[in-house]
């Protein structure tokens, strides 16, 4: 049964919710594709099964977001080839085609999953409790993915810390720039993300009690904490984040 967001909410507020769900659904589907692509890079059946479980979890998250959208009478846009997500996905595919498992895990389990945990945790406090519950529950599940990623990557970091940090920096400059662009200032018509139904949703976030700078700050803290856990020197990772779009 459809239970639309309270009638007192105007069309603009409803569209903000729809735009947020558009990003969430699309991001989960990109994650699903990424995890599925890892099967051919995994060294044994056990790890192949594990990444397929992760792919299934990402699909389930996307379906949960889609379900709550329908319940609330919202119509999100689903487009894994949207502008920023396409950049992230293309980078992942390039590394997968070169057989670079470490690079792929850095992108998916450190960069993307860390962003998901941070942003979904913030969106877990949205005014609409139905949507907030889905974001909060998904944040908790995504945190487990981050833990798995750290376990896999810790060995690579320990083998050659300097080489590992260099690899992260190179990937940071292609993938984290795309992610940061999603959280940066308002986009003009020529830079439309392809997921907002109208103008850029970011400037409308205060209508739901959200602050773009806070969202970005929490996302970057989560990312830096993940890198710190892998032994990446803080002076390096802080310099990388400092040069991202704001």
Predicted features, each with a name:
Residues 1-246:
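Non-heme di-metal
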């Amino acid at each position: 049964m459809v239970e639309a967001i309270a009638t007192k909410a105007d069309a603009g507020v409803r569209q903000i919710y729809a735009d947020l769900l558009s990003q969430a659904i699309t991001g989960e589907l990109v994650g699903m594709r990424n995890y599925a692509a890892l099967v051919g890079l995994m060294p044994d059946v056990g790890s192949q099964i594990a990444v397929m479980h992760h792919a299934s979890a990402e699909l389930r998250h996307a379906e949960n977001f889609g379900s709550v959208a329908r319940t609330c009478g919202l119509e999100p846009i689903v487009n894994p080839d949207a502008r920023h997500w396409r950049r992230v996905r293309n980078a992942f595919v390039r590394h997968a085609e070169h057989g670079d498992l470490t690079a792929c895990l850095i992108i998916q389990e450190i960069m993307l999953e860390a962003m998901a945990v941070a942003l979904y945790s913030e969106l877990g406090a949205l005014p609409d409790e139905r949507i907030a519950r889905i974001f909060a529950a998904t944040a908790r599940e995504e945190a487990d993915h981050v833990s798995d990623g750290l376990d896999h990557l810790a060995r690579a970091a320990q083998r050659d810390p300097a080489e590992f940090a260099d690899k992260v920096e190179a990937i940071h400059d292609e993938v984290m720039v795309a992610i940061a662009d999603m959280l940066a200032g308002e986009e003009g018509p020529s830079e439309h993300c392809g997921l907002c139904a109208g103008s850029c949703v970011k400037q409308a976030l205060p209508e739901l009690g959200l602050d773009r700078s806070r969202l970005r700050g929490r996302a970057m803290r989560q990312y830096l904490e993940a890198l710190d856990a892998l032994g990446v020197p803080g002076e390096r990772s802080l310099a990388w984040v400092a040069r991202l779009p704001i």
